[in-house]
Design a protein with these regions (language model features):
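Core dinuclear metal-dependent hydrolase active-site scaffold
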Residues: 17-30, 35, 165-192
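Core catalytic region of metal-dependent phosphoesterases/phosphodiesterases
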Residues: 43-155
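Short acidic low-complexity segments
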Residues: 151-170
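Acidic, histidine-bearing metal-coordination/catalytic regions of metal-dependent phosphoesterases
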Residues: 1-38, 42-45
Length: 277
């Protein structure tokens, strides 16, 4: 598949034209990515996990190049320090929490890992998964039996990102929340405030809302910041009568390249109407 000189050695392609041969250069396709971001799904025992199927079916229909779960797939309500000692804490079990989280991920993946479709999978550990690691720190005698390292995420095909370590995909940083380096706590404020603070495009979860900010840069490009922290189909009693009135859904980023993408937001209400059995 090439030209040889009189000694039998290959002639470099850049010399072919001088010998009267033309070479058709292979164009490298610079295709922007399509990325689906699954917000916090917070699977727990005794709730329906059908919403994971709806999300998975949508992913299969749209076939993004990358699927990012932004964290808090496992609720780990048995490890909540806020509820300990309350009546609502009665009956919670770690084993049931793990089983619910594992089942939710199986339901999600089963809907789109088929027919040759195999997107890149990225999982950003959330603060709810961090509860499991905190237990391992507090009870070192259980090392190897507890902690996120015992969850089957990697075996399921996910690239697992440590809690609060951002991952850069085409110039956009994905992480459960943006942490203030002085305190380790989440940055507050709107998506625009956070975008101005960190100076890079980002997608985060954690906060039960939908907030998006876009701003131009001096080089003629754009940056984007997205907060989308809920993709579960149940209400949380602790949030009260109005606290549950927030957006629930996922995000699809189209034409992702050079730190920007065009967002589309898909509500669980829409997914339920389209895919509910």
């Amino acid at each position: 598949n090439g030209l040889l000189n009189q000694y039998g050695f290959p002639i470099p392609e850049d010399q072919w034209e001088g010998l009267g041969f033309s070479i058709k250069k292979k164009e490298v396709e610079d295709k922007p990515l399509k990325i689906c971001i699954v917000a916090d799904t917070q699977a727990k025992p005794n709730v329906s996990l059908e919403y994971m199927k709806w999300i998975g079916k949508y992913i299969f229909d749209k076939k993004p190049d990358v699927v990012v779960h932004i964290g808090d797939a496992y609720d780990f309500e048995s490890l909540s320090s806020y509820d300990k000692g309350k009546k609502s804490f009665e009956g919670r079990r770690l084993k049931a929490d793990i089983e619910a989280g594992n089942e939710s991920m199986k339901l999600l993946l089963a809907e789109f890992q088929k027919d040759g479709y195999n997107p890149r999978l990225v999982f950003c550990m959330g603060n709810h998964e961090a509860r499991f690691d905190r237990l391992a720190d507090e009870m070192p005698e259980l090392d190897g039996f507890v902690g996120t390292g015992t969850l089957p995420l990697a075996e399921m095909g996910w690239e697992v990102q440590p809690f609060l370590k951002p991952i850069n995909i085409e110039g956009i940083f994905f992480v459960h929340y943006l942490a203030n380096p002085m305190t380790g706590k989440p940055y507050g404020g709107t998506a625009m405030n956070q975008l101005k603070t960190v100076g890079n495009s980002f997608v985060v979860g954690h906060k039960q809302c939908l907030d998006v900010a876009i701003r131009p840069t001096l080089d003629g490009k754009h940056q984007i910041g997205i907060i989308n922290g809920a993709a579960y189909d149940f209400e949380e009693p602790y949030k009260g009568y109005t606290g549950n009135n927030h957006f629930r859904g996922i995000t699809m980023l189209h034409e992702v390249k050079d730190g920007f993408g065009l967002p589309m937001f898909i509500s669980l209400d829409y997914l339920k109407k389209r895919y509910e059995d």
